[in-house]
Amino acid sequence: MSAKILAIDTATENCSVALLVNDQVISRSEVAPRDHTKKVLPMVDEVLKEAGLTLQDLDALAFGRGPGSFTGVRIGIGIAQGLAFGAELPMIGVSTLAAMAQASYRLHGATDVAVAIDARMSEVYWARYSRQENGEWIGVDEECVIPPARLAEEAQADSKTWTTAGTGWSAYQEELAGLPFNTADSEVLYPDSQDIVILAKQELEKGNTVPVEESSPVYLRDNVTWKKLPGRE
């Protein structure tokens, strides 16, 4: 399936846009924490112009649904909804944590990734993912927001070496050093739309899209317990 998907993400300090067309990705990104509203629409125009497409030519519009900065997540979904509504496109929300796992695979071939984004207030947004042979990512832990010291206390021992991604690892290096499994740094700090668009294609192929009015953010602030998902090794 040769899908044409535009992805937008402003959930963290990184502002990014990516366009998937003919299985090729055209992307723009810039770490600009306070300029997302200024940067994102020009990026959209650039990638569409480079591909010779308009919004009406696309099959879907994807967005980083969170977790991340409350303001950043709201900006991204608001802009994505506006574009999708005008072009009558279905939408696909993609986890920013899962996108960082995909980035670790893209850059380093990592297949077991532990993602921790600095959530401020002495907490991290946390999840672990394992990549399957079909390219899909399976969550090992339920996405949550949790104090890193508590995470280190509650996490179960594991024989795998987990590739780390996210700003939480440097922000809470001492606390997370207590985790009962080995880690290797991927140097992936932020989610990026070029990875969101790949995960969005998987969802599109499964028919997992929603209309504009049903697209929603994921903040995680009400999900504060670490939980290993059932049946996941």
Swiss-Prot record:
Annotated coiled-coil segments of the chain: none
Q: Which GO terms describe its cellular component?
A: cytosol
One GO term (biological process)? tRNA threonylcarbamoyladenosine modification
The subcellular location is: Cytoplasm
Q: Which UniProt keywords apply?
A: Cytoplasm, tRNA processing
Which domain of life does the protein's organism represent? Bacteria
What is an example of a Pfam family matching this protein? TsaD
Q: Which SUPFAM superfamilies match?
A: Actin-like ATPase domain
Its job: Required for the formation of a threonylcarbamoyl group on adenosine at position 37 (t(6)A37) in tRNAs that read codons beginning with adenine. Is involved in the transfer of the threonylcarbamoyl moiety of threonylcarbamoyl-AMP (TC-AMP) to the N6 group of A37, together with TsaD and TsaE; this reaction does not require ATP in vitro. TsaB seems to play an indirect role in the t(6)A biosynthesis pathway, possibly in regulating the core enzymatic function of TsaD.
Family that this chain belongs to:
Belongs to the KAE1 / TsaD family. TsaB subfamily.
Q: Subunit details for this protein?
A: Homodimer.
Question: What remark does the entry add?
Answer: Structural analysis identified two distinctly different modes of TsaB dimer formation. In one form, prevalent in the absence of nucleotide, the putative nucleotide-binding site is incomplete and lacks a binding pocket for a nucleotide base. In the second form, an interface between the two subunits apparently completes a nucleotide-binding site. This analysis suggests that the two dimer architectures observed in the crystal structures correspond to a free and a nucleotide-bound form of TsaB.
Q: What is this protein called?
A: tRNA threonylcarbamoyladenosine biosynthesis protein TsaB
Name of the coding gene:
tsaB
